[in-house]
Amino acid sequence: MPTYRLNTLAVAVAFAFSAPSIVNAEEAPAQAAKNIEQISVLGSRVSNRTSTESSSPIDLIDADDLTKGGFTELGQSLQATAPSFNFSRTQVSDGSDLFRPATLRGLQPDQTLVLVNGKRRHNQSIFGLNGTVGAGAAGTDMNAIPLTALKGVEVLRDGAAAQYGSDAIAGVINLSLNNSTGITTGFVQYGGTSEGDGDTISAGLNRGFDIGSEGGFINLSLEYRDADGTNRAERDTGGSLDVEPGTLSEDVRWGQGNSESEFTSLFYNMALPMGDGELYSFGGYSERTALGNGFYRNFNEASKNVTQVYSDGFLPRIYNEAQDISVALGFKGDINTDWNYDVSAVYGENQYDFTSRNTLNASYAAEYLFNNPGASDADIAENSGPSGGYSGGFRFDQTTVNLDVNGIVDIGRGEPLYVTVGAEYRKENYEIVPGDEASYACGLANMDTSYPSVNDPDQFAQCGFQAYNGLRPEAANDSDRNSYAVYVDVETMITDAWNVSGALRYEDFSDAGDDLIGKLATRYEFSDDFAVRGAVSTGFRAPSLQQSGYTAFTTNLGSDGTLTQSFTANTGTAFPSALGVDSLELETSTNYSAGFVYDVTSELSLTVDFYRVEIEDRITLGSLLTADDVSFSSEAVAALQATGAVQANYFSNSVDSTTQGVDIIASYRTEVEGGNLGVTFAGNLNDTKIDGVNAEDGIPEAVAFDDLQRSFFTDGQPSERATLTFDYERDAYTSTLRFNYFGETDVKYFGNDHIELATDGSFKATSTVESAVLVDLNVSYQINDMFALSVGADNVFDETPDELGDDEVLNAITNGAFKYPVRALPYGFDGRTYYAKVSFSF
């Protein structure tokens, strides 16, 4: 049965005046003047609305603003220009060093919808689990799209699921691809940190070609980036732990910093007039690799190391590879003078693979020695198994077919009723690929048998590769689903000063049910200089296949050599079903926003927008449960025992929350000393509260949603963000000075399944990154019509998080080697970076 969450009055009004809200642009730095008549793509199906005619807030950021400064990734550029956008720099978190969690307004990565040229983009195949912002949420890989390919970005800061479908709870980001022709542009950039590492070379090339004489074109973009890693680790001193003599090193053996990485991409955008219509297509391919670090294994950690292989211990490495491909094909044209259509199909695929390097499976050598007592060191080393191999991967693909019909209806007033009706079909597939046997096996025979370690018979050797234990065959999965949607948008001017718009959408998912949602938005202009706006909407996010289909098995080694299994059960299997979780349901939301637009003078403009987002049934991954934890259900105990595991967890719709805040943007432009000065302040305040935990009967709230998860939801992202940007242009010179403010983050180290490092409470329970202001400076000189030179520094004053104290858990875990926190890092710890860039255009 459909669920209807709109009251009768709202439905009636929505149907009468409904259409997506026209989004008014709060221009990014230096944009206020030149974008006065820029058409907004997001939030409205009406093609002739400008950015000054809005009912919901949107940031318009053009390519020039994205490429100011030394940032080479889209995520970093957006964070510097749109304060409601966060791009956390989590470290030592498996795949999150390639897939940074990108969020709006402090919500989850999968609660923001990303479009390319107005069409839905696919999500990434992987999500973070290892203590990260956005844990368990598969968002969109923002860095798969090169800056060279973009004409601009629009950030809609309002709930828009009724307009665009699932995921658009926090807002929508639309990436507009370059459509220029007849000009070649490009750049070469080199940079590095003031510590002497992180050397990065980037190069990009864009060229557009005319096709035929009727306005057809194809635009091609190529980009490459090669970055050395950074390392802020120090010599391990023992920290707060007692260590064996000889384990301390005079050298830095640990790794804490950005991964060594490489990025290659090729994108295209094309259109070809055909008769009364236009054939269009766009898409691209990108590949990124990164070589990250695990925790250092000391030589005397007998359960993890084999000294015949690594006499001084070893630093296991994780080689991550991400491949992304997308292609869109569509045709749009006129039905008559008042109506037009747009039909399209979009395919996108994301792959992520883990390969372990400089590692070992300690149980291989242990089994060999067990079966060959007295074996020589050389024989043990020779029979210790591989030092690396494939540890598994993830696949996700999505096909979206869409039809829009847009037109106008004369309703007897000066302005007609703008109408859009549409339908959408989507097909998704998710796959988990197991790793090589050595990556997870217990012994050469892989019989789930433990063996005394090679170097200490009183300890037992761990199974699988160190750092990233491989995905087991039991975790292999291949699942799919489909959905369809129908929607209607209408919009009109009630008076010359009053715009009303809204949307209705019905969507049905084969695995998660259906919903009818809507949006109402309005804008009233009291004068040419002052207008108020507001919106109310309902929305939803369907559980991703990555959540419902995710399974993982882990082999745990007890001190007595006992091997036990823990696993994450996917939706619909016996264990979660026995506890009442047969399937994941839709996350549902209600969004409220209200604000104003005020042109104080011809040079100064101000926008303020308040918002409130209420979300029910947010999906989280619960804590591991043992048979004792579920003893109230004999069915659950039996289901757990049938798997051979001693503990398990699963995703469920466990949390209700409210996020509220305000966005403030002020822009000022004037002439100073013969040049143009632009000053832009952009700030975001947000606060997330947990309203309730929907634990299954018999499961304590603290287990269903533990302190670790709670802290990431409420304090894992800055609740205050702001930028103050000064742009000055005079003759051939352009300079940009930007102040970036990041509020504090403070998250727990562990949840219920914690590591006991001390029993006297001497260790700090949380990881804190204090508030900070980072300053960026860029100066550019237009050498001639063809070449421009830019030099600058990001984080000029070398701001980093406070160093870890002796009472920090991470300090103890790493024997004092880690200098900075690794979780909930809004701005990282690499410090100051320098760069020089040569741009060309001909």
Where are these regions (language model features)?
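C-terminal beta-signal and adjacent terminal beta-strands/loops
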Residues: 124, 615, 687, 740-753, ...
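Outer-membrane beta-barrel transmembrane domain signature of Gram-negative proteins
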Residues: 314-327, 334-336, 347, 356-499, ...
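Short acidic/polar hinge/loop motifs at secondary-structure boundaries
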Residues: 119-157
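Transmembrane beta-barrel wall of Gram-negative outer-membrane proteins
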Residues: 182-185, 195-312, 316-336, 782
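N-terminal Sec signal peptide and the immediately downstream disordered periplasmic leader
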Residues: 2-71, 75-79, 142-145, 203-210, ...
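N-terminal periplasmic accessory domains that precede
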Residues: 74-77, 81, 100-102, 141-143, ...
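Extracytoplasmic beta-strand/coil segments of soluble accessory domains associated
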Residues: 79-124
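Gram-negative outer-membrane beta-barrel transporters
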Residues: 26, 421, 605, 609-751
